[in-house]
């Protein structure tokens, strides 16, 4: 009898978790906060505070940049250095000696993702930075990134982006269901489609120079994003072209145009 009750409880619990996952609804407003929302309400870029601000604003996504330390820890930071210390050449313990301006410690990618997983509205746009040491190290970072996301069961929160095409291909090799967009701007929509990418995420200048790529991408079932779009004129142009996402340091301005 007790076994039947326990079995019924387990089946109910699993069904509830499955239902919650199926009902997970992320925002669909196109607004991707670049390095989090950090400018209008000042926060350090790529900090947990800037992520929380993007979540509180209701952004569709919050972008963050990931490097790997000398001792193999994945950390969120835009530049190759943190307070003058080269991230790839320093241990995480060494990097922790210099906190962010708001007092936060330099966040690990794991801490950033766990913070994002406390809600179901804002996706996490995980930029895997190309290694400045070697291509092999970039591949290792890609592998560790996918392993981390899988360990945390965070796949539904994560879209990957990268400037290194081989890193993108590595992510897709390890997780063929992953959403991976390419940043550099030197691939056509057809090339991206052929290699299994989710879409392109190109500089606004590149998108304006190749406006036909927007329709081509959509015809192929790919998504279109542009970075870093801070001018209202460019935002309006992209909205008229019905792009899927707009990455900006000025999410407040973009929200004012879409509401």
Feature names for model-found ranges:
Residues 20-259:
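Phosphate-group recognition and catalysis centered on beta-loop-alpha active-site segments
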Residues 1-25:
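Bacterial Sec-dependent N-terminal signal peptides
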């Amino acid at each position: 009898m007790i076994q039947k009750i326990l079995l019924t409880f387990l089946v109910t619990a699993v069904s509830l978790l499955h239902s919650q996952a199926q009902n997970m609804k992320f925002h669909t407003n196109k607004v991707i906060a670049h390095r989090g929302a950090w400018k209008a309400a000042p926060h350090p870029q790529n900090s947990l505070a800037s992520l929380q601000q993007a979540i509180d604003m209701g952004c569709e996504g919050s972008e963050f940049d990931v490097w790997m330390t000398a001792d193999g820890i994945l950390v969120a930071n835009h530049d190759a250095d943190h307070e003058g210390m080269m991230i790839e050449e320093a241990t995480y313990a060494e990097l922790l000696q210099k906190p962010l301006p708001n007092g936060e410690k330099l966040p690990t990618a794991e801490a950033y993702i766990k913070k994002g997983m406390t809600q179901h509205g804002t996706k996490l746009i995980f930029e895997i930075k190309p290694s400045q040491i070697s291509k092999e190290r970039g591949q290792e970072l890609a592998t560790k990134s996918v392993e981390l996301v899988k360990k945390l069961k965070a796949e539904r929160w994560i879209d990957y982006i990268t400037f290194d095409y081989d890193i993108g291909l590595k992510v897709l090799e390890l997780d063929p269901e992953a959403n991976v967009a390419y940043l550099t701007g030197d691939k056509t929509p057809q090339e991206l489609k052929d290699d299994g990418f989710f879409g392109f995420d190109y500089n606004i200048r590149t998108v304006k120079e190749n406006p036909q790529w927007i329709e081509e991408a959509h015809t192929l079932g790919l998504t279109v994003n542009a970075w870093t779009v801070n001018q209202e004129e460019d935002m309006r142009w992209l909205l008229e072209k019905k792009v899927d996402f707009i990455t900006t340091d000025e999410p407040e301005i973009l929200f004012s145009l879409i509401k």
